[in-house]
């Protein structure tokens, strides 16, 4: 049986909604997930640690500021949002270096999206 490409990946998940953090932790049980619910904590984690990927909420936690930090550290970043799904936000995320943009309504497919990202980078 082929090993899951997500197995053991270190993922930083940042969202100000604790139910979203819990859901992502459940969905990514094969990964080492670290969570943060505010910009300051997420910034500290990004500066002090190494992650294979950062999953960042756009609204509520200054996702664009965190995206900039992740890109500077060479950490692939995926933008996650429920309310900021607009062409401008998608464009800005891509221009700033985001690897992917996932609406929260599509979180059920999160593992598929992340596998695709890691396979494309392999």
List each model region and its residues.
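Conserved acidic carboxylate
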Residues: 15
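Alpha-helical interaction/dimerization surfaces of two-component signaling modules
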Residues: 23-27, 45, 69, 92
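Alpha4 helix (beta4-alpha4-beta5 surface) of REC/receiver domains from two-component response regulators
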Residues: 65, 84-103, 108, 112
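Hydrophobic/aromatic residues positioned on beta-strands within the core alpha/beta folds
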Residues: 80-82
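Short amphipathic alpha-helix used as the core "switch/output" element in two-component signaling
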Residues: 59, 64-76
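Two-component/phosphorelay signaling modules centered on CheY-like receiver
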Residues: 18-34
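Non-catalytic signal-transmission and effector/linker regions of two-component phosphorelay proteins
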Residues: 1-12, 108-122
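Acidic, metal-coordinating helix/loop segments flanking the phosphotransfer/catalytic sites
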Residues: 18, 35-53, 61
